[in-house]
Design a protein with these regions (language model features):
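Hydrophobic structural segments
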Residues: 1-111
Length: 111
């Protein structure tokens, strides 16, 4: 039987984001990363579209109606989506670098 190279602790984050608020969600993400890393996690994984939140409301709006509400929510979603060229993930990247860990985080991306 081959020797094991070692084990690694993985953390799966199951904590909600601050929906439609990129900055506060990223700040919360850093707190969660620090907590998981302090417990020994080397790989930390966040849910799908964690930044700025999964658009679960889309399944609750009436098709062909709610235009004003739909437009406002969509505007906020786009406004708070991640722009990689603008460096929107710098907080997460800096935390990962400082703690020497790997982070997988789901985002809505815009360009």
């Amino acid at each position: 039987m081959p020797k094991r190279a070692g084990t690694h602790k993985v953390a799966v984050i199951q904590h909600p984001p601050v929906t439609l608020d990129r900055r506060k969600t990223l700040e919360r993400g850093v707190e969660l990363i620090e907590k998981a890393a302090s417990a020994g996690a080397r790989l930390i994984s966040f849910p799908e579209t964690w930044v700025p939140g999964y658009p679960e409301w889309m399944w609750r709006l009436r098709p062909g109606g709610d235009y004003k509400l739909t437009g406002e929510i969509h505007r906020r979603l786009i406004e708070n989506s991640v722009d990689l060229k603008a460096g929107d993930l710098k907080l997460i990247q800096a935390a990962a670098r400082r703690l020497k860990i790997t982070v997988s985080i789901g985002v809505h991306e815009r360009d």
